Amino acid sequence: MKCPKCGSLNDKVVDTRQSKDGTVIRRRRECLDCGYRFTTYERFEEEKIVVKKKNGTTEPFNKDKIIRGIRLASKNRPVSEKQMVEIADEIEKYLLEEGKLVVESTEIGDLVQEKLKKIDPVSYLRFKSVYNEFQDIKDFEKALKEIEEKGE
């Protein structure tokens, strides 16, 4: 670590302590060239998922955006807030476990639909209609037919 007083890279750690919650490590260091003591902190750097939108722009992954979309599709339906949060958490966990740090928005939409379909077919259809930009009644008929054929 570079000494803030003399700029030397020659130092030693004289004390190390972990924060109460275990997320930060505090280290007291001493410069071996000038004797100056200074403190450094180490924190875990979370991996950030980036979403590539349909128009080509990117934005940080936002679980709240998923929850808002599900909430709109599930208005007056038997889908609890807890279930909505669980869906968003499961999607984030899946993406991180798969190492997908850049993900297409369409993949996120597909994952939401897959999970919502298991909970409430009506909420699923509402979400699908907005997400897939249904243009007329035929789009709804096609989606309903798919649900019926799969016995859901």
UniProtKB/Swiss-Prot annotation:
Names of required cofactors: Zn(2+)
Co-factor binding details: Binds 1 zinc ion.
Alphabetical UniProt keywords: ATP-binding, DNA-binding, Metal-binding, Nucleotide-binding, Repressor, Transcription, Transcription regulation, Zinc, Zinc-finger
Domain ATP-cone: 49-139
GO biological-process terms attached to the record: negative regulation of DNA-templated transcription
Entry superkingdom: Bacteria
ZnF unnamed span: 3-34
InterPro entries: ATP-cone_dom (IPR005144), NrdR-like_N (IPR055173), RNR_NrdR-like (IPR003796)
GO MF annotation: an example: zinc ion binding
Record function comment: Negatively regulates transcription of bacterial ribonucleotide reductase nrd genes and operons by binding to NrdR-boxes.
Family: Belongs to the NrdR family.
Name of the protein this chain belongs to: Transcriptional repressor NrdR
Organism for this UniProt entry: Persephonella marina (strain DSM 14350 / EX-H1)
